[in-house]
Amino acid sequence: MSEKKGEVPYLGIIINYDKDKKLDKFSIDTLRDRYLWQEESSPQEAFARAAVYASTFQEETDYAMAQRIYNYASDLWFMFSTPILSNGGTTRGLPISCFLNYVGDSIDELTDHFKENARLASSGGGIGGYWGDVRSDGTSTSNG
């Protein structure tokens, strides 16, 4: 837990370090290990970062919305998805948990699918694909 106490301004909203007490030791350890940035000393700071990120569109932040989202997360009424909590408001990884892309029925489309998935996975995105247009098992792939 952070040594900071009470309500303080952070990233344009008010956070409450005392709300760390709502989390058990395992939760705090997991959040520190997997989700907090090095500069963040408390899960409350990560919740605020994600809330401000989720409330920003075209470089305009709705701080009242960010405050509400932070309040809901810090009261444990809901929790951010992993990519939002770990990557939202940062320059690392992608803030999206799952990409579903199309797989076509040609060598070029198949290899493009694998290249695209490699790029997405290396940026932290979950991946999947629609394979419905690929010919079935046992179907000839030659022209002769």
Model-based region annotation:
Residues 1-144:
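Extended catalytic cores of very large enzyme megasubunits
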